[in-house]
C-alpha cells in the first residue's frame, strides 16, 4: 500500500487533471455554439447591432428622417464614434454617391437660440459625446440640420439648410 502522503498527492493531481479536462472540454463546447449575427435587409449593411442604408433619392432633412422612421427604431444615422464614422463613410463611398453631401440625424431644434451652438442633438436622442464638425456651426446661418460632407470623404459634419434635398443614411434595428 502507498504511504498516506503519496496518496494525498496523487489525489490532488487526479482532481487537478479532472478540473483542467472539464475546463478544456467546456471551451471546446463554447466554440461549437453558433454565434448570433444580425441579419439586415437587402441593400443595407450591419455594423454593431444596427443596420445602415444609404438612400440616393434626395429628400429634405425632415422627410428623410420620417422615411427612416418607417424601419424598426429607425432614424437618420447618429454617428457616435470615429469607427462608426469610418463605417458610414465607406458605406456612402461604396454606393457611388458622386457629389452631394449626405443627411445625418444631427439637427438643432432650438434654431440657433441655444448659446454656444449648444442646441445640436441627434434625431434619435442619442447622447452627443463625439463631435466631428468640419467648421463650427454658425448660429446665424439659418442652417440647422447636419450633413456629412463630400469634401471630407463623408467623415466630417457641416450644417445645411433643412429644406435642401439630399441623399441620406438611415440607422435602424435589424
UniProtKB/Swiss-Prot annotation:
Disulfide pattern: 40-51, 68-170, 145-162
Signal among keywords: yes
InterPro entries: C-type_lectin-like, C-type_lectin-like/link_sf, C-type_lectin/snaclec_domain, CTDL_fold
Family matches, as Gene3D superfamilies: Mannose-Binding Protein A, subunit A (3.10.100.10)
UniProt cross-references to Pfam families, sorted A to Z: Lectin_C
Induction record: Up-regulated in injured skeletal muscles and peripheral nerve.
Listed GO MF terms: hormone activity; metal ion binding; oligosaccharide binding; peptidoglycan binding; signaling receptor activity
Name this protein carries in UniProt: Regenerating islet-derived protein 3-gamma
Species: Rattus norvegicus
Lineage of the species this protein comes from: Eukaryota, Metazoa, Chordata, Craniata, Vertebrata
Amino acid at each position: 500500500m502507498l504511504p498516506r502522503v503519496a496518496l494525498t498527492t496523487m489525489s490532488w493531481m487526479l482532481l487537478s487533471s479532472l478540473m483542467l479536462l472539464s475546463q478544456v472540454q467546456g471551451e471546446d463546447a463554447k466554440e461549437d455554439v453558433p454565434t448570433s449575427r444580425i441579419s439586415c435587409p437587402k441593400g443595407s449593411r450591419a455594423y454593431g447591432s444596427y443596420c445602415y442604408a444609404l438612400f440616393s433619392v434626395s429628400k429634405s432633412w425632415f422627410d428623410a428622417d420620417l422615411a427612416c422612421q418607417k424601419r424598426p427604431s429607425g432614424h437618420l444615422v447618429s454617428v457616435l464614434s470615429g469607427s462608426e464614422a469610418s463605417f458610414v463613410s465607406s458605406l456612402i463611398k461604396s454606393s457611388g454617391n458622386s457629389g452631394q453631401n449626405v443627411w445625418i440625424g444631427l439637427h438643432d431644434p432650438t434654431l440657433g437660440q441655444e448659446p454656444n451652438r449648444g442646441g445640436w442633438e441627434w434625431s434619435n436622442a442619442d447622447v452627443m459625446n463625439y463631435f466631428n464638425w468640419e467648421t463650427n456651426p454658425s448660429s446665424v446661418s439659418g442652417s440647422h440640420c447636419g450633413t456629412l460632407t463630400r469634401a471630407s470623404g463623408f467623415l466630417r459634419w457641416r450644417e445645411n439648410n433643412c429644406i435642401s434635398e439630399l441623399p441620406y443614411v438611415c440607422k435602424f434595428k435589424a
